[in-house]
Amino acid sequence: MRLWKSMAWGILLWHSQSGALCPAWPPARAAEEITRLQQQLADWNDIYWKQGVSAVDDSVYDQLSARLVQWQRCVGQDVSSTPVSPPLNGTTMHPVAHTGVRKLADRQVVEQWMRGRSELWVQPKVDGVAVTLVYQNGKLARAISRGNGLQGEDWTPKIRLIPSIPQSTQGALANAVLQGEIFLQREGHIQQRMGGMNARSKVAGMLMRQDNASALNSLGIFIWAWPDGPANMPERLSQLAKAGFSLTKKYSLVVKDASEVERARQSWLTSALPFVTDGVVIRMAKEPASQYWRPGQGDWLAAWKYPPVAQVAQVSAIQFSVGKSGKITVVASLVPVILDDKRVQRVNIGSVKRWEAWDIAPGDQILVSLAGQGIPRLDEVVWRSRERSKPVPPDSHFNSLTCFYASATCQEQFISRLIWLGSRSALGLDGMGEASWRALHQTHRFEHIFSWLTLTSAQIANTPGFAKGKSEQIWRQFNLARRQPFTRWIMAMDIPLTQAALQASGDRSWEQLLMRTEQHWRQLPATGERRAGRVIDWRNNLQIKALSRWLAAQHIPGFGS
């Protein structure tokens, strides 16, 4: 299937000074799109933190938040007002600020970050809700939500109802501040297979809803920071484990280089764990005194997240493809994203009717994942641009009996037919892909799908973009095609039969094929009444008859007298 293309149906992009890929919007539209997305994120954020429910998948929210920051940087706008952190509802001060964690993009950046740092450990990045636990005189005194990192809500009553969180401590932990992640306890959770399950939102919901004490039994705690705790990491982990925070010791590994981090990351991605994760955190054993901790300034730790199972991608254009059967398919061209090491630049939407139901236009943000065999799949539309500039689909008069001959309206189906006849299912013309067929047709203006048979070696060699070796290969392929058996040629003519049915029919010439009755076709494997009727229609089609006469004049096997 080939694509109808038009710049009028897409959006242009440009690179900002920061290197970000930016939509080439007029200033007014850029301001409007940024404001709309900012407001939508704020609304989702408000619902999430006030009602404990998620209106959108966690991963989608995170990616759209990053997209907003990108757009703001494109236009030189301050990003400090981006609503990606919880609204400040609580007024309880954290004894020690939550620093947050810097995200590292890939292994190369991880290597750069690790360079010059020593005594490094790696832990799973548990996906849940951050909390501060304050122990005084051996008792849990306060539990505070992360909030803005400096102050948050008092969650003490709810946290005291979670059985997995120790209510009393001894020794150095009798008077201590701990920071960690409240998570949804899982049995044998394999992240690669099971995904994130919106775990963060589920935990937030449990903590915010009233009268749900029994649900809190399913929550656990992973401590990732003990400010001003023992300087020796093994000692720190040992004391936490003795106090009932055993997961931290179990899932903390010494690492010396990025390879070891990568191995741990891959292992935790594919192994059964008791919690949902979204990456790993690398941290230095040596931390500054807690009085120096500030939100956004924790340079002693960094995260390397897992690649998302699905990516939010921006639609850059809508294109229509017409297959050899005349079926029109809609394809969305995308600003490229990486999924499982695969560069995804387009996704098949389906029929025109399905595209209209999806209501997708250039500028929209869609969620794309990989289906079987790595084929990009459209999952949902997560954000629609204000401007709805959509192309008009081509006329739907194409069918399985159109465009054997070239014309202005038949351009795409005609190219699809050339690609089909060159495939291994038909004539097997090695090296003849879409680009080669387009170049030949554009240069030599084919009359019909077999016009290439009359090209000379000189004509092929003079085709723009064809190197000497390639033109010689094509010349040989075209000559070898003349020796192909009759059944291969009628497959190239798109007879509506399977190869098995053709073999069972036993036809070796056009004359034999003309003598067959509809009853004969019905009796062939996988044929039946409907397909038999289509074979008769195909055989009686004027373009097919004209092609058979032309092939006879070219002395193609089975078509001559």
Swiss-Prot record:
The keyword DNA damage applies. PROSITE patterns: DNA_LIGASE_N1, DNA_LIGASE_N2. Keywords: DNA damage, DNA repair, DNA replication, Ligase, NAD. Its EC number is 6.5.1.2. The active site is at 125 (n6-amp-lysine intermediate). One of its GO terms (molecular function) is DNA ligase (NAD+) activity. It holds the Pfam family DNA_ligase_OB. It comes from the Bacteria. It catalyses: NAD(+) + (deoxyribonucleotide)n-3'-hydroxyl + 5'-phospho-(deoxyribonucleotide)m = (deoxyribonucleotide)n+m + AMP + beta-nicotinamide D-nucleotide. GO terms for biological process: DNA repair; DNA replication. It is an enzyme of class 6 (ligase). InterPro entries: DNA_ligase_AS (IPR018239), DNA_ligase_B (IPR020923), DNA_ligase_CS (IPR033136), DNAligase_adenylation (IPR013839), DNAligase_N (IPR013840), NA-bd_OB-fold (IPR012340), NAD_dep_DNA_ligaseB (IPR050326), NAD_DNA_ligase_OB (IPR004150). Belongs to the NAD-dependent DNA ligase family. LigB subfamily. HAMAP family: DNA_ligase_B. Catalyzes the formation of phosphodiester linkages between 5'-phosphoryl and 3'-hydroxyl groups in double-stranded DNA using NAD as a coenzyme and as the energy source for the reaction. This is DNA ligase B. It comes from Salmonella newport (strain SL254). The gene is ligB.
